[in-house]
Amino acid sequence: MNQNLLVTKRDGSTERINLDKIHRVLDWAAEGLHNVSISQVELRSHIQFYDGIKTSDIHETIIKAAADLISRDAPDYQYLAARLAIFHLRKKAYGQFEPPALYDHVVKMVEMGKYDNHLLEDYTEEEFKQMDTFIDHDRDMTFSYAAVKQLEGKYLVQNRVTGEIYESAQFLYILVAACLFSNYPRETRLQYVKRFYDAVSTFKISLPTPIMSGVRTPTRQFSSCVLIECGDSLDSINATSSAIVKYVSQRAGIGINAGRIRALGSPIRGGEAFHTGCIPFYKHFQTAVKSCSQGGVRGGAATLFYPMWHLEVESLLVLKNNRGVEGNRVRHMDYGVQINKLMYTRLLKGEDITLFSPSDVPGLYDAFFADQEEFERLYTKYEKDDSIRKQRVKAVELFSLMMQERASTGRIYIQNVDHCNTHSPFDPAIAPVRQSNLCLEIALPTKPLNDVNDENGEIALCTLSAFNLGAINNLDELEELAILAVRALDALLDYQDYPIPAAKRGAMGRRTLGIGVINFAYYLAKHGKRYSDGSANNLTHKTFEAIQYYLLKASNELAKEQGACPWFNETTYAKGILPIDTYKKDLDTIANEPLHYDWEALRESIKTHGLRNSTLSALMPSETSSQISNATNGIEPPRGYVSIKASKDGILRQVVPDYEHLHDAYELLWEMPGNDGYLQLVGIMQKFIDQSISANTNYDPSRFPSGKVPMQQLLKDLLTAYKFGVKTLYYQNTRDGAEDAQDDLVPSIQDDGCESGACKI
């Protein structure tokens, strides 16, 4: 290696390359790590040095060299690369490795317009000094490389044009805590700031992208998911599309309920005109969704919902596929098909499903969600009424078309609307759930808007976060984490701005939260349980019982302090009904775990004091924030021991947690013999979760005789999910073999559904 190379320093001066200095930094970064070779990293980076190279380029070359060595056999390179990257990041942000004092940092950032000036109005210099003592900057050293790159790319406050970075991770965590608890009484708030900071900076609570990147800055829109319902009028259709544009521009993921729109050929104004049907309006929504690209990368994302019995359903089911022409396809949204028991019954009995335009059958559309018996009565009545336009299709043909499209696109989702309303925190007679969101984990009431400022409409918002199951040692720890998550997210509802009155009204009235989990696969591996063989059923029952119990308890305590949410009377909780009362009883055949908590005392306390939040739980996908916590994604099994994610900084490799000790305990996705075990677990979770779950189905065609997944199997899994009370099904993944080519480096699916970090966390 040529010792005479000149390097250009950050201040522009030049000096001879100092290989000792590089060696010392590597020595420091490798301390306590196993099976990492400093000389390997040096060798790989030296060949890329050249005369006049900038010191910052040297640093980046070394980081890259370490990152390229991350593998199943040497997972600790992900920490070596991360420490080097943190060193580099702090140099860029502060000009030195040691971070400045918190107060000085905040003053500087407020002056630059990067932080919200209320921070300095709300807290004294003395309080900032106290917060500084809470911070442990060494926690930066616990990040994996993928986490540091995600922080740099998405979360740290920066100038996205020049790439300058202004903060490091511990400041992010403490300031999110400070912002969220700023309205708490002075005598208690710092204690909450400390507790919340400790929980998020040790990865016990995982926060969604909008909160991590936005809280502490002057922009205040952090709801991950937005649900907008459209009425059957031009005014409502236009109001819906302008609401979509407003929220897409703020990085939210959108769920659109377009199920009320009348079918092709319906009369308008008593027959004066002939209706063009759903497809032109779906196109209008697609244009709205794609109108604002986030940083020029891509447009927003939406899932659009309609009922299975809609007269146009056969044309709607194929909207996403690659056949057809531009005129009869709307490919850039995903779709959710809404089903209930009557539809499944017709399938099982080999009968027909009758299709109607919602505009021709008074009361049917509303009853589909609000009252299953009334729906069946009206449906059979309208089937017999010859004066009503209708079309009969064999149930098996309609279900097969739907499942074929789900299999070929992966993005036709399922919503069981009866489960969403019978096992729901809302009273379906007053506040029915008529749609879900982008990623199918939210189930909240909505009302159509007639114009964008309509006070009577309701746009549903949900604010998310998650518990990292891998970071807790016993279920009692969830009590404190539930208190912190509920209080922080509830405070966020008052802290954020609302671009549309109908959204503010719903958020303030219902105060809905969706707290989920990440790292479930690691949690199972740690306990020696598997997805597919039933061994995890009772553990899952115990775990999710604890989660929902402690969340309800935390919200009930908060209600004693700050009052119940204003629309508490629209919930089933107000009647003393709990999730343990309304779950699908078929679950008792697969989980015989008794209840472990005092639900009766909680029931009485909720009846007396109410809840601060109408909903508390939802299980969302968590691709990005799982990387920050070095965790597995949501409730999903990993696809490989090493996952690869492409990012603008190149390829990020991430090894499953504790691989060295647990590699035999993990059950990988494509090792599972089928969907049964997974769907049972989702059903058990859904017994307790008050909203819904982003649950996926997965198929490996090579497991079947002809190398094709039989339709019978797809329908059987759909019915299994329904039987166990599953409310929604999200992606359908099909193994295509290509992704296994790189030995053990199985690339994670590149998914553009929620790239905004919207209703994922």
Swiss-Prot record:
| InterPro entries according to UniProt | ATP-cone_dom, NrdE_NrdA_C, RNR_lg_C, RNR_lsu_N, RNR_R1-su_N, Rrm1
Which one of the record's GO molecular function terms can you name? protein folding chaperone
Q: How is its activity regulated?
A: Under complex allosteric control mediated by deoxynucleoside triphosphates and ATP binding to separate specificity and activation sites on the alpha subunit. The type of nucleotide bound at the specificity site determines substrate preference. It seems probable that ATP makes the enzyme reduce CDP and UDP, dGTP favors ADP reduction and dTTP favors GDP reduction. Stimulated by ATP and inhibited by dATP binding to the activity site. In vitro, its activity is increased by dithiothreitol (DTT) or thioredoxins (non-specific).
- What does the entry list as the binding residues for dTTP? D232, S233, L234, R262, R269
Any one GO CC term of the record: cytosol
Q: List the disulfide bonds.
A: C225-C462
Q: Which residues carry this modification: N6-acetyllysine?
A: K283
- First-tier enzyme category under EC: oxidoreductase
Question: What keywords are assigned to this protein?
Answer: Acetylation, Allosteric enzyme, ATP-binding, Deoxyribonucleotide synthesis, Disulfide bond, Nucleotide-binding, Oxidoreductase
Instruction: Explain the post-translational modification.
Output: Binding of the substrate occurs primarily when the active-site cysteines are reduced.
Site location (Important for hydrogen atom transfer): C225, C462
User: What is the induction note for this entry?
Assistant: Induced 5-fold by hydroxyurea (at protein level).
Instruction: Identify the residue position(s) of the site Important for electron transfer.
Output: Y730, Y731
List positions binding GDP: T209, N437, E441, E623, T624, S625
EC number assigned by the record? 1.17.4.1
Q: Which family does it belong to?
A: Belongs to the ribonucleoside diphosphate reductase large chain family.
NCBIfam families, per database record:
NrdE_NrdA (TIGR02506), PRK09103.1 (NF006578)
PANTHER family assigned to the protein according to its UniProt record, in alphabetical order: RIBONUCLEOSIDE-DIPHOSPHATE REDUCTASE LARGE CHAIN (PTHR11573), RIBONUCLEOSIDE-DIPHOSPHATE REDUCTASE LARGE SUBUNIT (PTHR11573:SF6)
What do we know about how this protein assembles, alone or with others? Tetramer of two alpha (R1) and two beta (R2) subunits. The B1 protein is a dimer of alpha subunits. A radical transfer pathway occurs between 'Tyr-122' of R2 and R1.
This chain's protein is named Ribonucleoside-diphosphate reductase 1 subunit alpha
Which species is the source of this protein? Escherichia coli (strain K12)
User: Gene name, please?
Assistant: nrdA
